[in-house]
Amino acid sequence: MRKLILCNPRGFCSGVVRAIQVVEVALEKWGAPIYVKHEIVHNRHVVNALRAKGAIFVEELVDVPEGERVIYSAHGIPPSVRAEAKARKLIDIDATCGLVTKVHSAAKLYASKGYKIILIGHKKHVEVIGIVGEVPEHITVVEKVADVEALPFSSDTPLFYITQTTLSLDDVQEISSALLKRYPSIITLPSSSICYATTNRQKALRSVLSRVNYVYVVGDVNSSNSNRLREVALRRGVPADLINNPEDIDTNIVNHSGDIAMTAGASTPEDVVQACIRKLSSLIPGLQVENDIFAVEDVVFQLPKELRCS
């Protein structure tokens, strides 16, 4: 009898829960429309559901009428966006994840101390753009080990490194090792920049890979952490698909042998995961569903003060 092993934790992290609540509570408090700069989180199901309730998603603040409210997404923004919002008399509400804010704060602090900052991340990702925007003259982004070899800094340059919060633990280990080898005096945060949810989801998946022959990651193609989960499996030789809907499941899975693991990115709603479980169960008669608990998460982030109940 084949098994479907469900990784835990999976799906929504506390930062995503908070960001969605920010939009929902704002809509309840002030009514539609509420403008949101960028997708609040990188998941089409979430974005479409909020759009149906009256949220309007924009990439540029010029598309927000003067004087309206605008919410910043969980990924964070550069200071230039806040300045533009102020100039246009927008009422801004910040849904940036607290762990992303921690990385912003570290960048500003160490730049003020005279350090050159190396940011491990994907240059075009909105989170990285926001961090770089804090102190652009101090930050250099590296995406791979080869970028470390091309860095122009001398051995006596004060260096500090941080990372995008949603990266592969494997990639960060490789790149940070290369940084330490080239610059032994480089320093970083006492605790990792990688967020707890990214770490837990990757480690939970790693822990079951020896027991399965296939992996499904439920998440959006635009979700960094969902893509990294798929890479965790592929890097260890286990075939893996990134799916956003039950319809994305290849019906040929019935012809595969062995057990299957399923996890979900940090912005994936649990109802989508459950729909995917039902689809697999319909394709594979007698499929046994087993929960594998790697960690229990209890992190909760408060809503912005303007949205808290008085």
UniProtKB/Swiss-Prot annotation:
Residue positions binding isopentenyl diphosphate: 42, 75, 125, 223-225, 267
GO biological process: dimethylallyl diphosphate biosynthetic process; isopentenyl diphosphate biosynthetic process, methylerythritol 4-phosphate pathway; terpenoid biosynthetic process
GO molecular-function terms, A-Z: 4 iron, 4 sulfur cluster binding; 4-hydroxy-3-methylbut-2-enyl diphosphate reductase activity; metal ion binding
Keyword Iron: yes
A Pfam family annotated for this UniProt entry: LYTB
Pathway note: Isoprenoid biosynthesis; dimethylallyl diphosphate biosynthesis; dimethylallyl diphosphate from (2E)-4-hydroxy-3-methylbutenyl diphosphate: step 1/1; Isoprenoid biosynthesis; isopentenyl diphosphate biosynthesis via DXP pathway; isopentenyl diphosphate from 1-deoxy-D-xylulose 5-phosphate: step 6/6
EC number(s) on file: 1.17.7.4
Active site: 127 (proton donor)
Cofactor: [4Fe-4S] cluster
Signal sequence region: none
Ligand binding ((2E)-4-hydroxy-3-methylbut-2-enyl diphosphate): 42, 75, 125, 165, 223-225, 267
Taxonomy, superkingdom: Bacteria
Chemical reaction(s) catalysed: isopentenyl diphosphate + 2 oxidized [2Fe-2S]-[ferredoxin] + H2O = (2E)-4-hydroxy-3-methylbut-2-enyl diphosphate + 2 reduced [2Fe-2S]-[ferredoxin] + 2 H(+); dimethylallyl diphosphate + 2 oxidized [2Fe-2S]-[ferredoxin] + H2O = (2E)-4-hydroxy-3-methylbut-2-enyl diphosphate + 2 reduced [2Fe-2S]-[ferredoxin] + 2 H(+)
Iron-sulfur listed as a keyword: yes
Positions that bind [4Fe-4S] cluster: 13, 97, 195
PANTHER family: 4-HYDROXY-3-METHYLBUT-2-ENYL DIPHOSPHATE REDUCTASE
UniProt similarity note: Belongs to the IspH family.
The protein's role, per its UniProt record: Catalyzes the conversion of 1-hydroxy-2-methyl-2-(E)-butenyl 4-diphosphate (HMBPP) into a mixture of isopentenyl diphosphate (IPP) and dimethylallyl diphosphate (DMAPP). Acts in the terminal step of the DOXP/MEP pathway for isoprenoid precursor biosynthesis.
NCBIfam families reported for this sequence: ispH_lytB, PRK01045.1-4
Protein name according to UniProt: 4-hydroxy-3-methylbut-2-enyl diphosphate reductase
UniProt organism field: Chlamydia pneumoniae (Chlamydophila pneumoniae)
Gene: ispH
